[in-house]
Amino acid sequence: MLKIFTKLFGSKHDKDIKKIQPTIERINEIFSSLSSLSDDELRLKTASLKDRIQSALAETEQKRNDLEQKLDNPELDLNQADNINQELDTLDTQFEEKTAAILEEILPETFAIVKETCRRLKGLEYNVVGHSMTWDMVPYDVQLIGGVVLHSGKISEMATGEGKTLVSTLPAFLNALTGRGVHIVTVNDYLAQRDREWMKPVFDFHGLKTGVILTSMKPQERREQYLCDITYGTNNEFGFDYLRDNMAGAPADLVQRPFYYAIVDEVDSVLIDEARTPLIISGPVPHSNTDKFIEIQPWIERLVKSQQNLVAGYLTDAEKALKNKADDFDAGLALLRVKRGQPKNKRFIKVLSQTGIARLIQNVENEYLKDNASRMQEVDDELFYSVDEKTGTIDLTDKGRDFLSQLSKQDSDIFLVPDVGAEIAIIEAEKTLSAEEKIKRKDDIYRLFSERSERLHNISQLLKAYSLFDRDSEYVVQNGQVMIVDEFTGRILPGRRYSDGLHQAIEAKENVKIEGETQTLATITIQNYFRLYKKLGGMTGTAETESSEFFEIYSLDVVVIPTNKPIQRHDLNDFVFKTRREKYTAIIGKIIELQEKGQPVLVGTASVEVSETLSRMLRAKKIRHSVLNAKQHEQEAEIVAHAGEKGAVTIATNMAGRGTDIKLGQGVRESGGLFILGSERHESRRIDRQLRGRAGRQGDPGESIFYVSLEDNLMRLFGSERVISVMDRLGHEEGDIIEHPMVTKSIERAQKKVEEQNFAIRKRLLEYDDVLNQQREVIYKRRRNALIKERLTADIFDLLHDHATKVIEKYHPNADVDGLEEQVLRELSVEFKIESDEFEKNSVEENADKLFQTAIAFYKRKEEMVPSNIMRQIERYAVLSVIDQKWREHLREIDSVKEGINLRAYGQKDPLLEYKQEAYRLFVELLREIELETLSLAFKLFPVTPEAQEQIEERQKMSQVRKERLVAKHEESQGALNAAAAQRAERPSSSDPAAEKAGTTAQPVKAEQTPGRNDPCPCGSGKKYKNCCGR
């Protein structure tokens, strides 16, 4: 049906291209008129375009500057400042709209100028990352289309070899004319430096400056690079610089400009594959729990060995039952227990590939999953712990708890977490207890909950380390360090660590030094970092399969750009084998066959382990080959670039060498072009498409095929029932190959299932981070304001106004003048005197105004005593030091909440709603503490002597964590993923009102507590109270 509608009305892609076509015709029309101009006349065209942009924006910019000058007036009252800020917001929106309009107007002429510049550069010889290069590129029409798409804030899907690097110069050039800076984001330092040097002549011709951000650069160098018109760099470097800027102690320490426009190369790799790993800057913590891992590691090792022995027994029983043709159900139950107890057991994986076994296990599992999985406990109770490989969760059983209690010589109750809510309710109901006794008992419950939760968490992480994480697959051990291997590229990720104690658990398992715990000082997810840009565009060869995620998360539409020449690559149906051994033997046979006829072959693998296995088999056959895993980017690009030569054999991880074209050597076209041989299907269809896309560039011939076995992870965990049933019906024997379009489609359906699951996890992670992101925006905005503003007096008086009202509201009902005067003196060092009669007679507003005026008079006297520059330092120090200290503490508390939040799913509560409530409560508390301590510090600091001034400077130094001890890392987030997995497994049905109610119970709000003007509005809008319901 869909095909019929597409034929009648045209596909979305056809419509997208048709809409852009008139613009392309206009570009080419202008381009044909530029050849008669001299070089200087062409450069004058660019200068003229800059002038047009400035003229279109001049009026709005002047209004904005005037309003910003008004804001600096210390005599402004609070309402006037709020009104100006609202006007500025309106002007900012108008400014962006006018910018978009003028750029759209000049786009055809600008693109034509870039195209003409490329034509004039033809034959230019220059160096690119140490290699001699000759410019031979002039944008084709399809590349112009790609440029228009990028400028529109969309994703341009262009096949490998279509010249995406050149395409990026078109929108980068256009948007750089605004003077606001353009960021071009790549996946590694090598590509950033290569692309900048490669495209530099185009920008240099017109006087536009290009820069590059590299890992090794110092802050001063980075600042200079960010001031360039176009800056290349990796997503990590851009993101970490953003976080470091929000820890800066002075305006001179800032390196980045406000975010305007970013073009993300390999956008799927950056925005999807990296999306589960937040950027984190961390510092050391005084106390670490590494000893606890060392203490319990021997217990867990014995527990795991006991489970392995138990599983081996079940496996033997099952094999005997199957051999003797005994009761199939008993055999299936034994195998199900093996699957739940040790899913990666190699003997089990072999048995699983036998005819009918997978179906038998599935039938038995379905029986126990009936009635909302109420009987699954019968399966797990015989094990020490159960493993769900799909969701990555592990549950300790009663049998496991008893085993650990015997090893630790402690009661098994120490492995049970108390129900805090129920215990508190019992304490509250106990009428014989005094208030002090109740408080003590509650404290004991909270302490017990904390201790046992942490112990269970450490046990769970160690069990994961032993059961789900394999050496030389998920990680490698080098020089006594556990290093993560990227699941997509097979490269080692130095400096990256698993979160939530998992990395320490793996270190304990491997008996290497356990690194101390770190404290998060600043963090942001990739998704929320790229949302900071006013406009975002992206390029890749494979985005269409993830188009829904791009649109839902980033509001990015995907436009598929036609190729310049038709694709000649022939994609063959998958070959399916029963075992990995058969598959590897077939791969080696195919490589020998291809090499004999001189056809180059690129073998794509999903892990380091597989690439090394194939390499050993090739060495045994004395076949010359290259292997790519965990190499430097420069070597990688070099090897991949030569992979198209006659007879070349290259083994590489599926995404190795992205961004580097494989050009065919002499005589290779005649032998069929590059042959792509995938050693297994990846979880994502997109990764497979990327591997196929290495062949058939720019109309070159090529072939691609995937060899799959039933023992591959994808087939084992998510394998289609149809594939298994087909192989069973055909009586598949060892060595047989199945090849049919239906089988290939079934495998793709299994991949789609995994993609949907992974998207749900990434989306859930983002939902968690969105909570923190709203808080981060508020804190960073306050901090940046304090850092850049010349005078903070108005802000401090704003806080004072709120505080005066709150303090008066506290003491007015009981007319407690003594308490009021004592608190004001203690917090602000202000002597406030008021008669009791007057205090009672006045309204809250009148008393608050009197306190406000008294405090202002005190502050102004202080300003007369202290030099102006010292006073400004005091104000800035008061705001920055308090924000930094309190934000660090808040992040630590948020991490603690996130670690255990998934457990609430077992109580039929939505962990996300619970997390939002906890995070909001903590944030309201954070803002109150920041405001009070900032106010207190600003009023109480009196550096009236040189000694006092030295003390302030010393405290400023002490408040900044020493930079050499900070660690910038891209951390593998586990806590929120586990919460998402638990939520997926345990989330109550949306049709269950009781469950919904349990998940959304709000904290009671006291009616007499009026929110402060700067507090978050209780309505949940995310705005300040004064800008929302408090107007």
Swiss-Prot record:
Official protein name in the record: Protein translocase subunit SecA
Task performed by this protein: Part of the Sec protein translocase complex. Interacts with the SecYEG preprotein conducting channel. Has a central role in coupling the hydrolysis of ATP to the transfer of proteins into and across the cell membrane, serving as an ATP-driven molecular motor driving the stepwise translocation of polypeptide chains across the membrane.
Compartments it resides in: Cell inner membrane; Cytoplasm
Oligomer and partners: Monomer and homodimer. Part of the essential Sec protein translocation apparatus which comprises SecA, SecYEG and auxiliary proteins SecDF. Other proteins may also be involved.
Organism: Prosthecochloris aestuarii (strain DSM 271 / SK 413)
InterPro entries assigned: Helicase_ATP-bd (IPR014001), Helicase_C-like (IPR001650), P-loop_NTPase (IPR027417), SEC_C_motif (IPR004027), SecA (IPR000185), SecA_CS (IPR020937), SecA_DEAD (IPR011115), SecA_motor_DEAD (IPR014018)
UniProt gene name: secA
Region of interest called Disordered, as start-end residue ranges on this chain: 963-1031
Compositionally biased residues, Basic and acidic residues: 963-973
